Amino acid sequence: MDAPKPWHLYLLLCRNGSYYAGITNDLERRFQAHLHGTGARYTRANPPVQVLASHRYPDRASASRAECALKRQPRARKLAWLQAQSSDTESHSADASITHI
């Protein structure tokens, strides 16, 4: 039996300069959904430019709790979270290239 896939809390940079936080168990698939307008309503109106950071969680419940906590934070705290994650995160840009931030 396969082990359950981990869940990811991710932070997107949107074209208008805003951030969008979400969770998924397949980060690449979810980012592509956001890019193609089949993701969240917010990213249909404010298309993403890149995944700024992500953090892995063992299950959906813990990822959801972390997402709620991150969404309640002001922009400055989201930036601090981003900086804390940046050392071990891959960044996915809209042109599908992968770079480290």
UniProtKB/Swiss-Prot annotation:
InterPro entries, per this entry? GIY-YIG_endonuc, GIY-YIG_endonuc_sf, UPF0213_domain
Region annotated Disordered sits at 81-101
Q: For bias kind Polar residues, which ranges apply?
A: 83-101
TM regions (residue ranges): none
Q: Which residues form the GIY-YIG domain?
A: 5-80
Family annotation (PANTHER family): UPF0213 PROTEIN YHBQ
Tell me the protein family, please: Belongs to the UPF0213 family.
* Protein name as it appears in the record: UPF0213 protein XOO1228
Name the species this protein comes from: Xanthomonas oryzae pv. oryzae (strain MAFF 311018)
Its taxonomic path starts at: Bacteria, Pseudomonadati, Pseudomonadota, Gammaproteobacteria, Lysobacterales
